[in-house]
Regions:
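Donor/substrate-binding cores of folate-linked one-carbon enzymes
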Residues: 21-22, 32, 81-200
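Internal anion-binding site segments
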Residues: 195-316
Length: 316
């Protein structure tokens, strides 16, 4: 099939690579406009654009998917199918109806669960045991179209949003190609989504990383994993930003009675390779962190150069 591929971030770039290595032809790539990045605010290409340019494929970067000039360009290209993976913009009906085989989307959750943005992070934040990828026909409303096929993955106990992203990126491309092959031969199913089971998730923002230590330790540990690598869980230590990269929940049998003398957010014990933080329910043991102006390091490395005392209150 002659395909137009629409996508923007790293997970979409991995899917694009799979399609480029298949029997199908990518005739053009559509991605979001270049954006300033880093401290120097230099313009950076979206990951999908980098892959497309390396493969010698034309790249389109419209400000809006409904721009008339862009829609006309798609009509001239006349693709058999439009493939969408984390493009970041809703497509108008005129585009959805354009290709012979329609527009199909690669979504990083087991629909109808987690429609919308950030499904990968929310699977970890909510402590899900499994996640997966859904290939679906696109509709005018977000993530509501009929399902073609899905593939599940099991979340590890120490799964981060970053590691789950990589798992789903690995299976997303091959699953999309299987769906394309099934569509081409007329064997692709159309499974309606159960609206009663549908859930929606919102986009993440940096403020979500500010940990509230009155929450249970189990929830905070998930939060640290679910916001890794972005936007990252954090707190304050003596007025400086302290990013929290890895933690463990201290087993109940290890807890002493000293915690009764402290408030949530207090450091209640300091060891050679870790320190313990009291929460609203349970204790969190820090294993990897990053103080403002420093690199990411293990807590053991951090404690070699920083004197930390029990009773210190985080968040101030």
């Amino acid at each position: 099939m002659r395909a137009v591929f629409m996508g923007t971030p790293e997970i979409a770039a991995e899917v694009l690579k799979s399609v480029l290595n298949s029997k199908h032809e990518v005739i053009a790539v559509v991605t979001q406009p270049d954006k300033p990045k880093g401290r120097g605010h230099e313009m950076a290409f979206p990951p999908v654009k980098e892959v497309a340019l390396e493969a010698g494929i034309p790249v389109l970067q419209p400000q809006r998917a409904r721009d008339e000039a862009f829609v006309e360009e798609l009509k001239v290209l006349n693709p058999d199918i439009i493939l969408v993976a984390a493009y970041g913009k809703l497509l108008p009906k005129v585009i959805l109806d354009m290709p012979k085989f329609g527009c199909i989307n690669v979504h990083a959750s087991l629909l109808p669960k987690y429609r919308g943005a950030s499904p990968i992070q929310w699977a970890v934040l909510n402590g899900d045991e499994k996640s997966g990828v859904t290939i679906m026909h696109m509709a005018e409303t977000m993530d509501t179209g009929d399902i073609i096929m899905t593939e599940e993955v099991v979340l590890a106990k120490d799964e981060t949003a970053g590691s789950l992203h990589d798992k789903l990126a690995e299976i997303g491309g091959p699953l999309l190609i299987s769906a394309m092959d099934a569509l081409e031969t007329g064997r692709a199913p159309r499974i309606r989504q159960n609206e009663e089971e549908a859930t929606h998730v919102k986009m993440l923002d940096k403020t979500m990383g500010d940990l509230d230590f009155s929450k249970p330790a189990v929830q905070l540990e998930r939060w640290i994993r679910g916001l890794n690598p972005w936007p990252t869980a954090y707190t304050k230590l003596n007025g400086k930003m302290l990013k929290l990269w890895k933690a463990e929940v201290v087993p109940a049998e290890e807890l002493g009675k000293t915690s009764k003398n402290f408030e949530p957010g207090a450091i209640i014990a300091v060891a050679k390779d870790s320190f313990d933080i009291l929460t609203g329910n349970g204790v969190l043991r820090m294993k990897e962190l990053q103080l403002e102006g420093k690199r990411k390091m293990t807590t053991e490395e951090f404690l070699r150069g920083f004197s930390l005392e029990a009773g210190t209150i985080l968040g101030r």
